[in-house]
Amino acid sequence: MNESQITQLAALCNRVLRQNWREGVENGTHYGYTAPSPGHYPWLWYWDSCFHAIIWRHLDPARSRLELETLLASSRDGVIGHIAFLGQPLNLERAMRYNIATRHAPTTSTIQPPALAWAWSMSVGDPRLESKIQEHHDWLRAHRDLEGDNLLWLIQPDESGMDAS
């Protein structure tokens, strides 16, 4: 790619990210995230948000931080579901396809590859300084490292990130 093509690609990426940005307040908490595909995937998705934050770091560092803070805010005792249903309710058809505890659950019950500490280090700073990231890793160790070998067990195939999307 030449410099002109790189500039055009960067402008296109910037436009798509800004177009897909969602911001609001839910349960008294300010949130902001990039919807992977507003029509089909309108909510916050764990590792998509990690990758979005890394890109936002170069375009708008405040959005980068907010994207990851929004992901952390969805944590329940350290578990961060692979989807946080922010901004619009989950319809019945989707509720039947996603692993959720109840129809009105704020997140799925399944996880995605734990890329949060890596994304935080690339986008915000030292992840060891953020206690909720440590809580997340403690939860993963306690509930998904079943043999104590630092390898996480998956409950269903989508948790690997190798799904049909």
Each language-model region and where it sits:
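Low-complexity, Ser/Thr/Pro/Gly-enriched N-terminal "stalk/linker" regions
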Residues: 1-44, 65-66, 70, 78-80
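Aromatic-rich carbohydrate-recognition surfaces in CAZymes
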Residues: 42-68, 73-165
